[in-house]
Each structure stands twice: as structure tokens, then as C-alpha cells.
From Swiss-Prot:
This protein's name: L-arabonate dehydratase
Binding sites annotated in the UniProt record for [4Fe-4S] cluster: C56, C124, C197
Keywords: 4Fe-4S, Arabinose catabolism, Carbohydrate metabolism, Iron, Iron-sulfur, Lyase, Metal-binding
Record entry for activity regulation: Activity is enhanced by Mg(2+), being optimal with a concentration of 1-10 mM Mg(2+).
Family matches, as InterPro entries: Dihydro-acid_dehy_C, DiOHA_6PGluconate_deHydtase_CS, ILV_EDD_C, ILV_EDD_N, IlvD/EDD_N, Sugar_Degrad_Dehydratases
Organism: Azospirillum brasilense
Transmembrane segments: none
Cofactor: [4Fe-4S] cluster
EC number: 4.2.1.25
Length: 583
């Protein structure tokens, strides 16, 4: 703890005996708060994304109670407040559309209220980046408490994974391998408790990223949602955030360039979601840390994927916790000289390496040795070329090795509705060597960059035993999904990107090793085609231009995938200077 305590923001509400202090205290006292609670102790916000519409976060009211116990025990004053809960499971057209809106909610709630530090209760995919983005814009002391994954999914005595099983079973249904009854019987078995997806999807990936970044306590990522140790971690986080408030340990001291480099390496080791590329860029943008797509190649390249979890591997998240969780992975990386910045500071005041140097590994089938990885080179690939001049991403650990270098004929879907209307057509001119191309599903074009990039294959090819094809889009893909899928093509079609120029029958070349994605037409032909494209005609854009509202604001200001899909006016740190009095 520093020798001089920082001045707490909350004293500018409750620390005076004038009219303003009287009013602020009086209003709070209608909740039964006694005088001694206003003695200058740190006021700790608990930013809660609980909602019955976000089943991943359905247990957060109980989680918040355990955080409060820790805060009170440490001498703090807990105040819980709600923010927009942008859950992936129900929210249309995409939770990505409202990630930035949720971050604005968080930022303004922190800055405008008597909050000295904040605990971020995050669970479903976009809640973690949204909360971190908002808190980073204020640069206050903050700690992430993730909700944790669901219990293992079960079907007919076997483990099944959230999301992953949906894609697998639906493909089997379309191929005629199972009937509808068998397909629907998996619903309850896949989701057996509160919590996030029990695979290494985006929610678990971002929980791991929070831990690797140092903004969460060790083991935050993997403890199952309904395990009592999840509530112990919440309690201990409540204790620690009070200490952080008194120490002045703000996010900018933790979310450094070194921390982001550690997170990129960790993402490769766990086989994490491609969505982390967008979210880490957005968080870095809010805290003022430069982070580029090339960093993913430089740091992630040649990193073995050593965690054998669905969708890349065999096991669900519950087994990951029992094996040792992320600390065991980080220790293994560190001992192999693969942890870029072991001295990076974390929320408990220790270095990342100090937190993990003694971490045990209880199951080397789940967390493998470096010399026996699941994938020898598992880092997310960044692709560039005339089809993606500002980049695209591909996840090798979820792809088919034989398709990572491929040349095929394009089968083009102008938008998601076009895909849905034609994919089941037995007359569709497509074969296993074709490259499926989906346009107008990016940040502006959808809008909100939905998770539709892992297009299901045509039933006629599934019946032939085809399991994977090269797919290219400006969309995203669920972290629970798999396949040789090129995502986040930038610029997107609805921003006038080259993807808009692709036509049926064009030849496309993918070379993952070389990092290239090439449309085999001349530059002159590409320019000629693009001159005929009207980006405002994309269905997602055209459908919103006359309506106004948040979606219109988003379309007008959203950045491209390589820039993190933040709104242009939100990038940067605005601090937590106390605003003027409200009366």
C-alpha cells in the first residue's frame, strides 16, 4: 500500500457538512444506512449484469452478495448497481451491436456516482469486454469476477459441449444421421446449470483473458458457476477491491502493453475464441495501449495449444478447472520460456508469475505438456491480401489441416437471408472444393457483426460425408464453433471492402502458413467491380438509415474489425474526474 492514501472520489459527495453533503447522505439513508457508514470508507460499486434474459448470468444476485460480504469485511461500503446485460443467447440481432452501448452504461454509471472502485460481475460473452471497456475509460481501481462455466453437458452418458454440440447435432440432423427427437433431447442436457458455455467459447475465453491480463484473481476463469469456490473467489475479490481503492491501484497500472502480450500468448495456448482479437483491441483502445493485428502473429505464432478443450479438443470447462485451470497453463508457458512478460502486475499486487509459479497440473490429458500439444502452432492467424487488405482471422486449432492451404471456386451469398434461402437447394452449384463466401454480415452490414461466419454446409454435401469447407465472411463466429472459417474480413462489404466484389465462380486462394487471402482477379477488375457497389444498399444499413435510434448511431460510428469495432468517439480514456453537482 502506498504511504499516502489517494483522495477518494466519494468524499466529494458524502464528506462535507454543507447542503450538498446533507442531501446526498439523506437520500442514501432512506435505505437504512447508519451514520457511521459515511465515515470516509471506500465506496465500492458492484457492477451487476444479472438478468433473467441472460441465463449465463442468472446466478449473479447471489454472487453479488458474496462480493458484498468481502467488501464489508475489509471495511468498505458496497453499493450494487445494474448495467445493460447484453447476453448472447437471446439478444437480436447480435450482442456485439450492444457491447459498446453496455460499455457506455458502465462508464457513465461509474463516473457519475460516488464510486471509488468497482467490481465487475461479468459472464456471457460480451459482458466481460463491455465492463472492462467502460471501467478502462474511467481508469478506476477495478477487478473482474466472472460468473463461471456451466456444469458439463451430458447426453446419453457422454459429455457434450455448449454451442459445440448444437453445430454437431444440427449437421447430423441435416445429414440424416439422427432424427428430430434425438436432436431436441440434447437441449436440457447441454445446459444443466447456471453459468456460461461449458466449452472454450468466447465467455470462457474472455474470463481467461481477464485472468491473463491480471484484472482478476487466480482461478477466476474456470471455477464452475455453481461451485462454492466461485463464491469464495467473489468474497476474496470484495476484500481485495477495498485494498485496491486505498492503494490507488487503477486499471492503467495493470492493463499495460505487457499485460496484453501475455493475454495474446495465453489465448493461443488455450485455443481461445477469435472474438478475443476484437475485444482485446477495443479494451486496449480505451486504456490507450497500442495493439495491432500483427501482434497476434508476432506473439501468438509458434505457440502450442496445450489445452484439450472443446471445440478444438475433447474436454469441457469443468475438467479444465479440475486439471488446474489457467494458472497451470501460465506456469507451463512460463517454464517453457513462452510467457512474454512474467513480471506484469496483477490486481492482487503480485506479478503474474508470482501468482502461477507453484500452480499444480492434475491432468496432463487436459492441460498437456509443451512437447505433446493439441496443436503445435495454435495462435490465431492473421490473413491479408487483396480480399482482406486490412486483415482477416482464422483459428487453426478449430480448422481442418488439409484446408489451410486451398484454392477453390467461390459460391457467394449476398447476405444471411440469401444463404438461408439457397443453402438447402439440391440444385445449388457447390462441391467440397468450393469456397463459401458470405457478405454483408460485418459491423455495419448486419448490423452488429453476428456470429454467422461458420455457415452450415449444404445438406447434399453433408450426406456425402463432407465435414468441413473453407468459409469466408466479414462476420464473427461463436467461440464454441469450429471449422476452416475465415472471419472479420476488413474492410467489410458494407464499408466498400473487396469482399463486396466477389462473384460466383471466382477463384480464391487461402494460404494460412503464408498468411494470405487472395481473390484471383486483376486489380483493374476489382476496382471496376467495387465502383458499382453501393455500401448503403447492404440490408442491415439500408434497413436502419431511416429509423434512427442506437442502431443508426452504431452504423454511423462503428470502427472496423481490425480496429476493435468500438464507436469512434469512445476510443480513449476520459478519466473519473468528479462531475459538477446535480443540484
Amino acid at each position: 500500500m502506498s504511504a499516502t492514501k489517494p483522495r477518494l472520489r466519494s468524499t466529494q459527495w458524502f464528506g462535507t457538512n454543507d447542503k450538498n453533503g446533507f442531501m446526498y447522505r439523506s437520500w442514501m439513508k432512506n435505505q437504512g444506512i447508519p451514520d457511521h457508514e459515511f465515515d470516509g470508507r471506500p465506496i465500492i460499486g458492484i457492477c451487476n449484469t444479472w438478468s433473467e434474459l441472460t441465463p449465463c448470468n442468472a446466478h449473479f444476485r447471489k454472487l453479488a452478495e458474496h462480493v458484498k460480504r468481502g467488501i464489508s469485511e475489509a471495511g468498505g461500503f458496497p453499493v450494487e448497481f445494474p448495467v445493460f446485460s447484453n447476453g448472447e443467447s437471446n439478444l437480436r440481432p447480435s450482442a456485439m451491436l450492444t457491447r459498446n452501448l453496455a460499455s457506455m452504461d458502465v462508464e457513465e454509471a461509474i463516473r457519475g456516482n460516488p464510486i471509488d472502485a468497482v467490481v465487475l460481475l461479468a459472464g456471457c460473452d460480451k459482458t466481460t469486454p463491455a465492463l472492462l471497456m467502460g471501467a478502462a475509460s474511467c481508469d478506476v481501481p477495478a477487478i473482474v469476477v466472472s460468473g463461471g462455466p456451466m456444469l458439463n453437458g451430458k447426453l446419453e452418458g457422454k459429455n457434450i459441449g455448449s454451442g459445440t454440440a448444437v453445430w454437431q447435432l444440427h449437421e447430423a440432423l441435416k445429414a440424416g444421421e439422427i432424427d428430430v427427437h434425438h436432436f431436441l433431447s440434447a437441449e436440457a442436457g447441454m445446459s444443466r446449470s447456471a453459468g456460461t458455455c461449458n466449452t472454450m467459447g468466447t465467455a470462457s475465453t474472455m474470463a481467461c483473458m481477464a485472468e491473463a491480463l491480471g484484472v482478476a484473481l487466480p482461478h477466476n476463469a474456470a471455477i464452475p458457476a455453481v461451485d462454492s469456490r466461485r463464491y469464495v473467489l467473489a468474497h476474496m475479490s470484495g476484500i481485495r477491491i477495498v485494498e485496491m481503492a486505498l492503494e490507488g491501484l487503477v486499471l492503467s497500472k495493470i492493463l499495460t502493453r505487457a499485460a496484453f502480450e501475455n493475454a495474446i500468448r495465453a489465448n493461443a495456448a488455450i485455443g481461445g475464441s477469435t472474438n478475443a482479437v476484437i475485444h482485446l483491441k477495443a479494451i486496449a483502445g480505451r486504456i490507450g495501449v497500442p495493439l495491432e493485428l500483427e501482434d497476434w502473429m508476432r506473439i501468438g505464432r509458434d505457440t502450442p495449444t496445450i489445452v484439450d478443450l472443446m471445440p478444438s479438443g475433447r474436454f469441457p470447462m469443468e475438467e479444465f478447472y479440475y486439471a488446474g485451470g489457467l494458472p497451470a497453463v501460465l506456469r507451463r508457458l512460463g517454464e517453457g520460456g513462452l510467457l512474454p512478460n512474467p513480471d506484469a502486475l496483477t490486481v492482487n499486487g503480485k506479478s503474474l508469475w508470482d501468482n502461477v509459479r507453484e500452480a499444480p497440473n492434475y491432468d496432463e490429458e487436459v492441460i498437456r505438456p509443451l512437447d505433446r500439444p493439441l496443436i503445435a502452432d495454435g495462435g490465431i492467424r492473421i490473413l491479408r491480401g487483396n480480399l482482406a487488405p486490412r486483415g482477416a482471422v482464422l483459428k487453426p486449432s478449430a480448422a481442418s489441416p488439409e484446408l489451410l492451404k486451398h484454392r477453390g471456386r467461390a459460391v457467394v451469398f449476398e447476405n444471411l437471408d440469401h444463404y438461408k434461402a439457397t443453402i438447402n437447394d439440391e440444385a445449388l452449384d457447390i462441391d467440397a472444393s468450393s469456397v463459401m463466401v458470405l457478405k454483408n454480415c460485418g459491423p455495419r452490414g448486419y448490423p452488429g457483426m453476428a456470429e454467422v461466419g461458420n455457415m452450415g454446409l449444404p445438406p447434399k454435401l453433408l450426406r456425402q460425408g463432407v465435414k468441413d469447407m473453407v468459409r469466408i465472411s466479414d462476420a464473427r463466429m461463436s467461440g464454441t464453433a469450429y471449422g476452416t472459417v475465415v472471419l472479420h474480413v476488413a474492410p467489410e462489404a458494407a464499408a466498400g471492402g473487396p469482399l463486396a466484389a466477389v462473384r460466383n465462380g471466382d477463384w480464391i486462394e487461402l494460404d494460412c502458413e503464408a498468411g494470405t487471402l487472395h481473390l484471383d482477379i486483376t486489380d483493374d477488375e476489382l476496382h471496376r467491380r467495387l465502383s458499382d457497389v453501393d455500401p448503403t444498399a447492404a440490408p442491415g444499413v439500408a434497413g436502419q438509415l431511416g429509423k434512427g435510434g442506437y442502431a443508426r448511431l452504431y452504423i454511423d460510428h462503428v470502427l472496423q474489425a481490425d480496429e476493435g469495432c468500438d464507436l469512434d468517439f469512445l476510443v480513449g480514456t476520459r478519466g473519473a474526474e468528479v462531475p459538477s453537482h446535480s443540484h
